Design a protein with these regions (language model features):
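Conserved hydrophobic residues forming the short capping helix/wall of the S-adenosyl-L-methionine
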Residues: 73
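Short S/T/G/P-rich N-terminal loop/turn motif that feeds into the first structured element of a domain
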Residues: 1-51, 57-68, 78-94
């Protein structure tokens, strides 16, 4: 299994939640190899910082969704800044 880890800075909370609900979560959960996913945020320095971890059955499937998330973020620069996207091998779970 592989995890897609995404870090963002959120500028527009309402619009970001709308994007999560309408595009990001449905797109990830409907993607080939999807296992589970968690999207989180916290407030730090006046802006919200988001972190998600989405688990897939393979590195290839995780990378494909990472590419889609990059495209969504590129279309919404006023709402969210993509700070990082990486794929990691899952080495343990509970």
């Amino acid at each position: 299994m592989h995890a897609l880890v995404v870090r963002v800075t959120i500028h527009n909370v309402d619009r970001t939640r709308e994007l999560l609900d309408s595009q990001v979560v449905p797109g990830a959960s409907g993607a080939p190899g999807f296992k589970t996913g968690y999207w989180t945020w916290s407030t730090g320095g006046g802006e919200k910082n988001g972190l998600s971890m989405i688990i897939f059955d393979s590195e290839e499937n995780a990378r494909a969704v990472g590419d889609r998330i990059r495209a969504i973020a590129a279309d919404t620069p006023d709402d969210v800044t993509l700070d990082g996207v990486e794929v990691r091998e899952v080495v343990a779970s509970a």
